């Protein structure tokens, strides 16, 4: 992060703009909207500045830049078409420990100004760090269309209710659940937009007096195979509402960066052949946190119901009477194959797909005879350590040694790596790869050279 986003309180504080043209005028509007006590210095001014000065909204200082104008300032903006003058303003401000923005020269500035979506008191700022103002503007336009104009009224009304809500609800968790109900209540939003005081009061009283469910809950969320862009919208909503997020090592850092900042994070990383935290203990963590009345998200790589032990975890919650729900995720087989250019089914090569775990509970045995049949695709999860055995068993049961195979490491991530070969090479290929990896076996692998679209490291 090159810039720390902050919101400045400038009301009745001295600010300086050097420049009297159109660019300076746009900056002046923002500072005036923020209530700043504004001085503008330039050799000449466009008419808007004169109009503002005549209305007593700002002070004009006509003439060359004088560094003493900065002596009482909190913030300055250099907005002239003279690079040397802008640099001089910046250096003078720096010497006085005053933040200074230099228009169109972010490297010379000590702060930059973002694109703003104004739903006062709710404010959203978008910045590209000065590298691409056009991109920031396009993002702002998209956000403008997503955020209702009356959102500011809802935020302002919430501010008026804070004291009462604090008295009504004893804990932070209860208050947060109330606010979540209020902010998604369409009737209240519409009543505020229409200034319908009777409806506002009725809806508010109903929301405040409606009993809250003090039980916690657990939401099982599939994080997808790695690329944060593959996290579902509902999954994103859940991790941003969670009090506690229990996650494993298959959840990428990019996805964890989307978690609500003040949520507790509990790492229970697991890998094939080694469990950092025993499954029974994970079950108890979920139960314990939910019994405290917290909203718990169990965040799992891929899909929680495909080799994710989601069923085992939910059985514990069900037996204890804890409410739960499930948000599916894109499973590794689907994500890794798509990002590797390998269709799992194809009219000419595969009419079915089998998803198989590479390690079983002690004493488990696969139906190798059926797995060795043609016209299907096999996908082995967590099979890297058993690759040589998989190779041997499939060949023993009749699968041709030249059957195409691929191993996908860190599928869908920028560090994705894919190697392919034949079944007779599977054990050898596996020694070149690291976990997490997925093994794909079938004629469809032969289409990879033609259909691969994602970079291969």
Swiss-Prot record:
Domain of life the protein comes from: Bacteria
UniProt-annotated catalytic positions: 248, 270
Region: Precorrin-2 dehydrogenase /sirohydrochlorin ferrochelatase, residue numbers: 1-204
Amino acids binding NAD(+): 22-23, 43-44
Keywords carried by this UniProt record: Cobalamin biosynthesis, Lyase, Methyltransferase, Multifunctional enzyme, NAD, Oxidoreductase, Phosphoprotein, Porphyrin biosynthesis, S-adenosyl-L-methionine, Transferase
Main function: Then it catalyzes the NAD-dependent ring dehydrogenation of precorrin-2 to yield sirohydrochlorin. Finally, it catalyzes the ferrochelation of sirohydrochlorin to yield siroheme.
Name of the molecule in the record: Siroheme synthase
Organism of this sequence: Escherichia coli O157:H7 (strain EC4115 / EHEC)
Taxonomic path: Bacteria, Pseudomonadati, Pseudomonadota, Gammaproteobacteria, Enterobacterales
